[in-house]
Amino acid sequence: MTWHPHANRAKTFLLLVLFSGLIVGVGALFGRNIMFLAVLFAIGMNAYVYFNSDKLALRAMHAQPVNEMQAPVMYKIVRELATTARQPMPRLYISDTAAPNAFATGRNPRNAAVCCTTGILQMLNERELRAVLGHELSHVYNRDILISCVAGAMASVITALANLAFFASMFGGNRDGGTNPLAILLVSLLGPIAATVIRLAVSRSREYQADQSGAELTGDPLALASALRKISAGVERAPLPPEPQLADQAHLMIANPFRSGEKIGKLFATHPPIADRIARLEAMAGPDTYRHPGLY
């Protein structure tokens, strides 16, 4: 298999530059002294995001590390796929939630982690689970997860900055003549929108690519199509709770973790439609491919 990490390194660098510019720009609204502090804050946050982005996602999902004895099937599949790909094996985690989903996180293949929820482990058969883990490993080996984790951390910080700007506009006023309360108010209103746009920008095309790469790694596109169909139905029955810290990490999941009818499910629709992804995978398999009754 051929992996494509270089383009995502460049995208990550551009995201960090954008992130820094946004922080400095918000700082400038509060005056020169605050802008200087914002520069230092941007440098510190870039370092923190780069080295700790995996911890943010795992913490949000209350994920716990597991070994071969605790999760033998998951461990066996990931070890086999990593060997096939000639890539490092990531750390494995399980999140104890009925919501069926999976995600990968970490700044590079040697510092990566793959997490499955108990819901997805109970829902899928081994062939489907293998397809899902192949999808997640494709994110790891293409270095999608670095840009995804940076985007998620950026979204969290942007939301925090928006809240700060809102309270500053409410209580800070323009007493020292160095701030523009209208501009600050605009930041507080547009910040959450910017956070959502960032997540959307890095997520949708990655999922199509990971579907294709994962199907090539496992050699079983129909199993992934079947898994996506089950996950989509399962999310409607058992979605993740609509909490901000989970919304900030939603783009990492293999499928949108929120119920489609909920407001947050529409606002944070970071994934392409499941039907489109399934259609592409079935096209990969070919029109004459036998559909296993255990899958469909």
From Swiss-Prot:
CDD domains: M48B_HtpX_like (cd07336). The active site is at 136. Coiled coil: none annotated. Binds 1 zinc ion per subunit. Its cofactor is Zn(2+). Zn(2+) binds at residues 135, 139, 207. Its EC number is 3.4.24.-. InterPro entries: HtpX_protease (IPR050083), Pept_M48_protease_HtpX (IPR022919), Peptidase_M48 (IPR001915). The gene is htpX. GO terms for biological process: proteolysis. The chain crosses the membrane at residues 10-30, 33-53, 145-165, 182-202. This is Protease HtpX homolog. It is an enzyme of class 3 (hydrolase). Belongs to the peptidase M48B family. GO terms for molecular function: metalloendopeptidase activity; zinc ion binding. It is found in: Cell membrane. It is a multi-pass membrane protein. Signal peptide: none annotated. GO terms for cellular component: plasma membrane.
